[in-house]
Swiss-Prot record:
This is Ribonuclease UK114. It comes from Gallus gallus (Chicken). CDD domains: YjgF_YER057c_UK114_family. Belongs to the RutC family. Endoribonuclease responsible for the inhibition of the translation by cleaving mRNA. Inhibits cell-free protein synthesis. Cleaves phosphodiester bonds only in single-stranded RNA.
Amino acid sequence: TTVFLADIKSNCPSRVSFQVAALPGARVEIEAIAIQGPI
């Protein structure tokens, strides 16, 4: 986050990370984004 804030002053990009070891036996990873209002 600190690195992003040094270069990007507004509209910071979203970031997602998963710890694979915390998903024992998982075969699928799902990420979703919800938007409310006009784009």
